[in-house]
Amino acid sequence: MSTASVPLPNWINYGLIPILNLVVAFLISGFVVWVIGESPLDALSLLIQGALGNGEGIGFTLYYATSFIFTGLSVAVAIHAGLFNIGSEGQAYVGGLGCALVALALDRYVPWYVTMPIAVVGAGLFGAAWAFIPAFLQAKRGSHIVITTIMFNYIGAALMVYLLVHVLIVPGKMAPETRTFLEGGQLPKLGWIMQLFGAKLGAAPFNVSFIIALVVSYLVWLLVWRTKLGFEMRTLGVSPTAAAYAGIPYARTVIIAMLLSGALAGMMALNPVMGSSARLQVEFVGGAGFVGIAVSLMGRNHPLGIIVAAILFGILYQGGDWISFEMPNITREMILVIQGLVILFAGALEYMFRPAMVRLYQQFKRG
């Protein structure tokens, strides 16, 4: 019997195994830091100080985490239906277009709290539309969802570059970006949260999209574990054969799951587009779609776990920037290596310790 199918207590499956993966990732990262002549303990101290040492650092950490929550949820919803959506990056790009079009159309006439829900819908619809073709090809033609979503990442990026360079660019400007949104198209910062703890947000773009991400996380939990559609998705993900015998329509479930996944990825655009830069720019996603894969796997595809994992990766991103600033020998490329190791052990090697844990747990039960 495969160890992957052996049930383990939640404290092992959702607690101990991810912690072991993280410890190994940080040990190897520490070795890399030591090899290049720096102190691993000093680097760890700078990582924590940069990400959590003051209100501005915490603000940046939660800003990054907000994007990762959306993309992590996007990946998780698809995984529950047995689909591996690698297209969150492209879906977030196209979702940014929907978000920006709403902001550009309404920012002159209504306040941000009117623009925001319409922008959420616009970003979600555009992201879902970009996921529809891969979903249709998987459901109706048998095309592999991994291949088609990867291809659509590149198509989406190219489409955004074309639109920003030739259509949406401000006349007379060289920068490929839209005009800056007026106040009605900008999400307010959450500096008041930092003030509750006696800290200042500073220049951090931590904004109200974080609250939206938490609300959406709860709604995803309700959908997946408390609705008929969620049950059908999980059944299809666990056993397509059982789903077929139960009369669960394969094509409909696949398409709906991918539409939801694409919509969640598209909503990620609210954070950088309306919450930070207040305009649509090239490459605003910044790899968040791919980080969402590791966030989802590390969080065991559960919204609560995804929130925790997203904050961890927010710490890595913000703390990594601080390390590269304070330790010149550790370049930005080295920080990417450290982040990559965490992604490797949290995502690709998430079951590395599981066989040993299964054997130890079974011996303990027999003993």
Residue spans for each PLM region:
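Cytosolic-side transmembrane-helix boundaries in multi-pass membrane proteins
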Residues: 1-24, 30, 238, 245-252, ...
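Short loop segments and helix-boundary regions at transmembrane helix junctions
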Residues: 5-16, 79-88, 111-120, 124-185, ...
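Single transmembrane alpha-helix segments in multi-pass membrane proteins
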Residues: 31-36, 46, 51-106, 120-143, ...
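Short, non-helical or kinked segments that cap or interrupt transmembrane helices
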Residues: 38-42, 79-98, 139-148, 232, ...
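Transmembrane helix-bundle core of multi-pass membrane transporters
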Residues: 149, 153-224, 279, 334, ...
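Helix-loop-helix "hairpin" substructures at the membrane interface of multi-pass membrane proteins
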Residues: 194-279, 303-304, 308
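Transmembrane alpha-helical segments in multi-pass inner-membrane proteins
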Residues: 259-340
